[in-house]
């Protein structure tokens, strides 16, 4: 999720018994600047502190199989780490791909923002290839019968934007096909969420193999997250695939989870990385984690005040606090003990460093108190 950079961001672990309870001064539409806490240490920060773990990662995807945790992250051929617990120790054990992605575009050597799901007897690793700041992108998928390294088959292209077959069709003609996330319901129906900047976050249904889009995307595509008014100026890049004429909308990194009776759509909003410590964005413009919910996996998703995420809504769940800066790239891991929200963040004030400690923060939940 987010534009790939050399900066190592952090995954966090909050020692909580449920997703944290706090007040966020009310839900605010994305068009308005949020009064997100400044990252300097403040005792009144309403978010839980972090618990350190020695693990460097960006855009994490974690699954739990037979007592072992597997993490998939950006890096050459998609890195795999394993650990006996979320606390670690995490050990790099190999990669998903044995070679560069078979998709002939973008950064084929180090695909971005992988997400791995287990469905039936197969593990699916969805990934993106792109070039930073442009929407000439594609989403691919690899499969294996086991979650560890070795035995993965790269099936290549699933969807693409910018150039190539199908990129001129709706919704790919206006979107950026990165940050893939796949949800498979109890009925076996699969859905692909994707999108970064441009026209926001979209969803298309997948067929039963999870290797192809089902139906006609022109009628089946759903725009899940968007904001009409762009908060950032338009790019002046000479390549039309690298500029947004109406301005930039920093929405990306979606993830869909289910906690009966609601489907929760999580996403990241704001600037993810490449921070200048002497000129940080205004408070609330850096990454934060937002959410909306719906009774249907297809939406529409709304925040606490009933605002549609496709019209600027979004409940702030976690934002900068203490030494945590720009948390995002979030996902939810469902365990017997409850749902676990995990994410990466940049450590303040060393937000530019390439060598930093990592904190694995998990918000364990038996109830979604942030919605009360």
Swiss-Prot record:
Biased composition (Basic and acidic residues): 35-45
Region annotation Disordered: where it falls in the sequence: 26-52
Coiled-coil regions listed in the entry: none
Pathway(s) it belongs to: Glycan metabolism; L-arabinan degradation
Entries under InterPro entries matching the protein: GH43_arabinanases (IPR050727), Glyco_hydro_43 (IPR006710), Glyco_hydro_43_endo_a_Ara-ase (IPR016840), Glyco_hydro_beta-prop_sf (IPR023296)
Alphabetically ordered keywords of this record: Carbohydrate metabolism, Glycoprotein, Glycosidase, Hydrolase, Polysaccharide degradation, Secreted, Signal, Xylan degradation
Site (Important for catalytic activity, responsible for pKa modulation of the active site Glu and correct orientation of both the proton donor and substrate) location in chain: 179
Top-level taxon: Eukaryota
KW DNA repair (keyword) present: no
Localisation per UniProt entry: Secreted
EC annotation from Swiss-Prot or TrEMBL: 3.2.1.99
Gene Ontology CC: one annotated term: extracellular region
Pfam family, one: Glyco_hydro_43
Glycosylation sites: 363
First and last residue of the signal peptide: 1-16
Function: Endo-1,5-alpha-L-arabinanase involved in degradation of pectin. Its preferred substrate is linear 1,5-alpha-L-arabinan.
Similarity section: Belongs to the glycosyl hydrolase 43 family.
Name the record gives this protein: Probable arabinan endo-1,5-alpha-L-arabinosidase B
Species name: Neosartorya fischeri (strain ATCC 1020 / DSM 3700 / CBS 544.65 / FGSC A1164 / JCM 1740 / NRRL 181 / WB 181)
């Amino acid at each position: 999720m987010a534009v790939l950079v050399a900066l190592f961001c952090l995954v966090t672990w909050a020692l909580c018994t449920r997703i944290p309870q706090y007040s966020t001064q009310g839900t605010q539409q994305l068009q308005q600047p949020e009064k997100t806490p400044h990252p300097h240490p403040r005792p009144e920060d309403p978010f839980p502190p972090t618990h350190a773990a020695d693990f460097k990662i960006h855009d994490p995807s974690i699954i739990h199989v037979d007592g072992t945790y597997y993490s998939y992250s950006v890096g050459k051929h998609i890195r795999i780490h394993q650990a006996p617990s979320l606390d670690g120790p995490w050990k790099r054990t190999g990669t998903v791909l044995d070679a560069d992605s078979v998709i002939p575009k973008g950064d084929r050597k180090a695909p971005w923002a992988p997400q791995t799901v287990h469905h039936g007897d197969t593990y699916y690793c969805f990934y993106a290839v792109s070039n930073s700041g442009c929407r000439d992108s594609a989403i691919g998928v690899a499969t294996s019968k086991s979650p560890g390294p070795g035995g993965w088959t790269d099936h290549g292209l699933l969807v693409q934007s910018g150039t190539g077959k199908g990129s001129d069709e709706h919704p790919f003609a206006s979107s950026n096909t990165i940050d893939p996330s796949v949800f498979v319901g109890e009925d076996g129906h699969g859905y692909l969420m994707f999108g970064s900047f441009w026209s926001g976050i979209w969803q298309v249904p997948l067929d039963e193999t999870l290797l192809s889009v089902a139906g006609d995307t022109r009628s089946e595509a759903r725009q899940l997250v968007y904001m009409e008014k762009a908060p950032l100026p338009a790019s002046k890049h000479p390549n039309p695939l690298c500029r947004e004429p109406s301005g930039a909308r920093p929405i990306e990194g979606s993830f869909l989870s289910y906690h009966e009776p609601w489907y929760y759509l999580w996403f990241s909003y704001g600037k993810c990385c490449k921070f200048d410590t002497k000129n940080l964005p205004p408070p609330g413009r850096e990454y934060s984690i937002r959410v909306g919910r719906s009774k249907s996996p297809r939406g529409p998703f709304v925040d606490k005040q009933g605002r549609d995420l496709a019209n600027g809504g979004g409940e702030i769940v976690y934002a900068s606090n203490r030494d945590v800066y720009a948390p995002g790239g979030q996902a939810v891991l469902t365990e017997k003990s409850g749902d676990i929200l995990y994410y990466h963040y940049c450590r303040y004030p060393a937000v530019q460093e390439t060598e930093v400690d990592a904190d694995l923060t998990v918000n364990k939940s038996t109830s979604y108190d942030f919605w009360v």
